[in-house]
Amino acid sequence: MKEQRTKQVLICLAASLGCFWLGNRMGVLYVSAVGTVTQRLAAAANLSKIVLHPLQLSPAPIPVCCGVGAILLAGLAYLCIKYSGHRLVPQKEYGSARWGTAADIAPFLHEKPSENIPLTATESLSLAMKMPVTAENNYNRNKNVIVFGPSGSGKSYSVAGPQLLQFNSNYVLSDPKGELLDTYGNVLVSQGYDVKVFNLKDRDKSDHYNPFAYIHDTDDIVVVAKNLIKNMKEDPRQKNTADPIWEEGSTSLLEALLAYVYFEQPPEKHNMNSVMELFVLMQHRYGPQGRSQLDDIFEDLAMEKPASFAARQYGLYHMAPDKTAQSIDVSLGMRMSAFNIPSIMKICEDDTIHLEELASDKKVALFVVTPDTTTAYNFLAAVMFQQCFQILVHTADNREDHCLPRHVRFLLDEFPNIGMIPDFQILISTIRSRNIGCTLIYQSIAQLKSQYGDDWGTILENCDSELVLGGGNNPESLEFFGKQLGKRTIEVLNTTENLGAQGSYNIFVGSPTASSRVAIQLVA
């Protein structure tokens, strides 16, 4: 700040001396000239005579007054320009957007190339938690990157691949079809990574994932239940227009079942298979009131432990009329039917993935492989991602520096296809300080809006880096990216014709930095 002020003082002093010199020289020429006042003024304004004897200054009153007057006039002109409300920005009147240069990206780079997040061949983003801060600029950016590119634009191999090959983070990847695993799995192993795979496409080759391994209290139970109910719908992105009692009743029932397994059964029974075993008991009804064996279990629990979360949630579910409760049973049963598939039962009976290892300084990479032809099992991926975020945030918050020892990077290819992570718009705004970052990959703006509805803007705002691999043919995306590029001022030749005479002059107009069609070819 002090250096900047000194520079400003020196500039003002130099400008004042220049103005005084010019005024004094003009005063000398005026005094020495002969003739009328007009002739003497013309002589004083003769540039060739002014510079002919540049050091011929005079202490006489008129030249000195001319020098001081020149300083005052220059100062007055400066103040008028600055405070008149008309800011002059030559050739920027209609916009100052321009293409970035190497000098623009340089402050955001780490001195070690291996500690950057590569974005393009020439642009990267430092992984450093703290970047330079000056009086004019704050170069700190969160590590969230959002990518837009239509099918075939190379999102996987040109974005996810280069970020993986930096080997500077622990990685969690959504991997439609398993192509990233096939390409980079062995490379990561050769670099000392412990590679884990949750494979919903080829489940015989999958590590095991048990949501109960990461449940520690009722809060975790509520999160898992809500996530499952949300993502086990045919289209999780579709707003619920039916009576809320169906979804709320299903949620209460599922919370009761999860809580009973976790709090009332031995650790070896803590898995979704046990939940389904309880659910089956609802089918065995007896007596004129149609009671089920599950009713008896929770009635006994309520008598033994009145404050039990499981008993209370079951009581909320049981407040529904009999026909409504039976409809809730059928609805939840249909949603939970995937847990009756033998291969799903097998990979969810215990846990070998150990999500907590991602929060350590150990090198770990987790590939979540999902089929690209069906979304039937993506609810499990959505639950895993949410639990993973929870574990990482909890671990960071319990460290002295509230930061993970090793950056954890989520490379979420085809992000809309893994279901919905509840409250993701809140999550992405809070993970930066924990040394966590996301690369979200979409095909278009429309996909982002469809996935998270009114919250799409919040997610976009919390991604400081945006990478566009062409806009495809989606008009909404093309218009959006074109507006983001802004306008620049260009000079054009305007020709007029008047009474047979032709004249021309230059004018400045505002022009988009790139048209919608040009935006198709952008790699920014």
Q: What kind of feature is each model-predicted range?
A:
Residues K201-R203, S444, G472:
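Short, solvent-exposed coil/turn elements at secondary-structure transition points
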Residues T241, I245-T251, A256-A259, E356, ...:
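P-loop NTPase motor core of the ASCE superfamily
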Residues N170-S174, V195-F198, G437-Y442, E466-G470, ...:
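Short hydrophobic alpha-helical runs that function as membrane-insertion/retention elements
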